[in-house]
Amino acid sequence: MYAACSFLVNADIICYLDEDNWLQPNHVQSIVDTFKRGYDWVYSLRNINDKDGNFICEDNCESLGHWPVYFNDGIFHIDTACFAIRRDVAIRIGHAWYGQWGADRQFFNAIKQQYKNYGCTGEYTANYRLDGNPNSVKKEFFAEGNAKMKQKYPNGYPWLGKNKLVEV
């Protein structure tokens, strides 16, 4: 579906969204503003919510794009709902969406290798719902991960671009 949408939409920028997640009202505007810096593709940060949609925390440990996940400095990730891609780029890279669980990881690995000019909005505008599928991590994953990242970056998270520390 994600690969096909590149050919079905009539827009300059394509945002993606899984059926169990949602976006903040300022998501698209923050994406568009970040694209004005000349990027091929952009990503936002995400909030973590329980299965009923209640806020748990900001994700400062997994879906960080330029920065590795907390448990392995060799693994990088961006959640599907955080991606926004210029349509012309999406058409050329769309084949990288495989359609199975983990497709966002496979897609991210492909796009970051082929299109190295990308940026982060620095805003938590995507909302990820825990327990959306059987492979979903639990809230303890984020509690542990955020605590470790707070120790790793005591002077502020670099993905925020403002060198500020978010309390977890």
Predicted regions and their residues:
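Nucleotide-sugar donor-binding/catalytic module of glycosyltransferases
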Residues: 1-168
